[in-house]
Amino acid sequence: MNKNVSLVNYGKTYERRPLFYAIISSEKNMSKIENIRLNNISALEKNISKSNDVAIVWLSYNVHGNESSTTEASMQTIYELLTERADLLENTVVIIDPCLNPDGRDRYANWYNQTRTVPYNTNKISREHSEPWPGGRANHYLFDLNRDWAWITQVESQQRLKEYHKWLPHVHADFHEQGINEPFYFAPAAEPYHEVITKWQRDFQHMLGKNNAKYFDKNGWLYFTKEFFDLLYPSYGDTYPTYLGAIGMTYEQAGGGIAGLGILNSEGKNLTLVDRVRHNTVAGISTIEISSANSKKLNEEFNKFFINNNNVNYIINGDSDKINQLSEFLSKHKIDFYSPKVQKLSAFSYNKNKSVSYRTSSGDLVIPNYQAKGKLVDVLFERNTKLSDSITYDITAWSLPFVYGLNGFSTENKVNVSDYIENKIENSLDKNAIAYAGVWNHMNDARFLSGLINNKIKVRYNEKVIKNGEVHLPRGSYIIYKGDQIIKNYDEIILNLAEKNKIKLDNIYTGMSEIGPDLGSESVKLVRKRKVAIISGEDSSNMVSSLNYGAIWHFFEQELKYPLTHLNIENFDDIELDEFDTLIIPSGYYGSLGNETNLEKIKLWISRGGNLIAFENAIRIFANKDGFSVKVKRNETERNKDVKFEDLSRERIQNYLSGAIFKVNIDNTHPLAYGYENEYYSLKTSSSTYEKLKRGFNVGKIDDDENSTIGFVGNKIKENFKNSLVFGHERIGRGNVIYFADNILFRNFWENGKLFLVNSIFYIN
């Protein structure tokens, strides 16, 4: 291999394709590359800074698999760096990840190569420009990896994050493609910028933009800046690096999955793959050039970024399993956290939205922002994100205490801390016990239950609170009664599964309870093994949301580890629903699935004992239809007819919701809400609203509460959310319908919502 290049294989995708990046620099720099890396990350250590004069630039390509020109451009960029622009490598280390999403790229490339004509057809109605569902944009599980940088739910993101933290580059550019009628977008970004972004980071975005503009102007290429793509939501390929000291940027070339080898845009211009590659290559070289010219300043400002003069402690209180899960997440981001010593202090309560007197406990978690990654801590933990502009590209609220279902506090008071030690769980299953039991409140419990069912262990759950000896069992707790078991080695299986899933089990010695029902009561029910199916795909009048479908698929396969049968919607007429007792319909756009014939088929199946689970837009299939009680809640707000044309976008956002947190009142006596408190904070990403059920159970609802929202919600729709349904359940014959108006699996990072889905499968009889 060339002495200027080193190739690093850092993992594999779900489909076992390799992930790798190239390190490119001068021979001199390559001979001391490890010293350069270590000197750079020394900025994270207090009072230690071994600054380099070498700029570190990381270029990422093809995070969206069907944005195909980007990987091609990565190879051309490496070639030019090793030939006519080798001068840039004297004081610059360039890291190039040519394809962040090989599974998506191969899905797209294989389809295109099987479909295209020779010569290629530039007419956009040709089938080579009509990518079939689900497209190549997403990864194996149909996740958008460009929204997964912070949440690291996918294996590609998890492996890349480890490498990124080894380097922490000064500049990071993320190469994308957009619609064929948009020319090229590069920095500076649009507002809003998050308030932790420094003046230098803003200024350098403008410097980069001007350098790119110089080359684009020279070549007569159109471009635009400062529009659409902001720097707020923390899980993008531009924002996450920005919150770790880099100049983070998105580059968007015209193209995408529709473009192929060439296509005529709306102006009649032939947009070719060759042109797209050239534009991306020029932008990449220009980025390296301006970084090389400012290598000293980049190093100086990078070191300054990690000096934090603020003094805020974030204190987290709640269930120990959830706290342990949060601590594991923080460890992956190399964020420091501690256990507090018991003390009383004044703190701001996230749930109460006001200052309170709070007494810490040893089981709490403390995350100080006066650490190297303090700015990232602030971004992830802040309750309310300040918006310099309410027109933003993504969700506006993501505070981690709400994500994990924990109580959050912030304080500027000093908190005395010690090292955090995770509680170790040890189980001793007594042979004299008649049953083992555990409390239901976390995905660890859900995985444990799934494992028990898959191993033919019988499990019961209680519909009423039980106190049996020293054992207290809230509703929904799982009870493994020995008399139910028919396999011989059940104790060994139970113990192994409990250890694997960090489950604490209690021994029960009698079937007679002191408080609540005895173990033989009809309110202590057997958990049934469910045959679960999900609708997928598209046909002429229906399209399942690939993102929602993928999130559910990933949840069953990678988290719950429970079998799921995938049904193609184009075959719905021929599917015998009676083979399944649970059917999930993801969000999507549905036409014929809601026609009279199919509705009768679904309704008959439900009445015979089927459980239907409808996500978000799928609820509209049944809204206002005979036999179903769910109804769309209309927004009665009228549009301002006197608005100026130039103010139209501002007028529209008054009816807009990109993503905000809502306080939801929960009926936790209902099986759908077992394991939850009476308040739940839900991430709402759609302006669709539904009336409370008149026939059924309003398990989760938004009441008339002025302090119920966190994040941006348009003024004209805010009122419409009041007194609306979030989670509902109605009975039809011997079966059930579950309505999830909010996506409890949104990007699979909203951890506290996942138990609702498990409850809907196993606890709704």
PLM ranges: what are they?
Residues 1-83, 87-93, 147, 153-155, ...:
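Intrinsic-disorder/low-complexity accessory segments
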Residues 94-108, 649, 659:
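Short, conserved secondary-structure transition motifs
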Residues 164-178:
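Proline-aspartate-enriched helix->loop->beta-strand connector
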Residues 124-143:
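Aromatic- and acidic-residue-enriched carbohydrate-binding clefts of CAZyme catalytic domains
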Residues 97-101, 111-112, 175-182, 618-619:
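Short, solvent-exposed turn/loop segments enriched in Gly/Ser/Thr/Pro and often Arg
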Residues 106-123:
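Aromatic- and acidic-residue-enriched segments that line the glycan-binding/catalytic groove
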Residues 144, 174, 252:
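Acidic active-site catalytic centers that drive phospho-/nucleotidyl reactions
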